[in-house]
């Protein structure tokens, strides 16, 4: 499951997660809407390996700014609260899975 989080939840959950994938997106973004079901599927297939979160850049712009998000969708892979890799734009599930596994 991909959990939508606000700023407080991000600090309390995503930043404290051992390994997390954060999806920075917006409701009006077409590629973001295409990516959402891909991430849901991956979150089920990779359950127990990492936590999946979604941040709406319009609702929490300060987080987007902190992570240098200038284009969406933007995926940030985090380990122990620190970003380790970033992917911008839509990618099919198999490519995303390979990217994640290559960075965790």
Regions found by a protein language model. Give the residues of each.
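A short beta-strand-turn-helix
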Residues: 2-20, 61
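CheY-like receiver
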Residues: 12-13, 63-66, 99
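Conserved helix-turn-beta segment immediately C-terminal to the redox Cys motif
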Residues: 17-19, 36-55
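Short pre-active-site segment immediately N-terminal to redox-active cysteine/selenocysteine motifs
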Residues: 18, 25-28, 71
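Structural micro-motif
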Residues: 20, 61, 67-76
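Conserved redox-active cysteine motifs that mediate thiol-disulfide chemistry
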Residues: 24-38
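Adenine-nucleotide cofactor-binding loop residues
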Residues: 58
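Non-catalytic, surface beta->alpha helical segment in thiol-disulfide oxidoreductase systems
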Residues: 79-104
């Amino acid at each position: 499951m991909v959990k939508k989080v606000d700023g407080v939840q991000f600090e309390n959950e995503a930043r404290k997660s051992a390994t997390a994938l954060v999806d920075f997106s917006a409701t009006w973004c077409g590629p973001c809407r295409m990516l959402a079901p891909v991430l849901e599927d991956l979150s089920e297939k990779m359950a127990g390996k990492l936590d999946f979160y979604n941040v709406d850049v319009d609702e929490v712009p300060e987080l987007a700014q902190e992570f240098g998000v200038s284009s969406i969708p933007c995926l940030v892979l985090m380990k122990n609260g620190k970003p380790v890799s970033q992917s911008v734009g839509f990618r099919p599930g198999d490519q995303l899975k390979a990217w994640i596994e290559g960075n965790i």
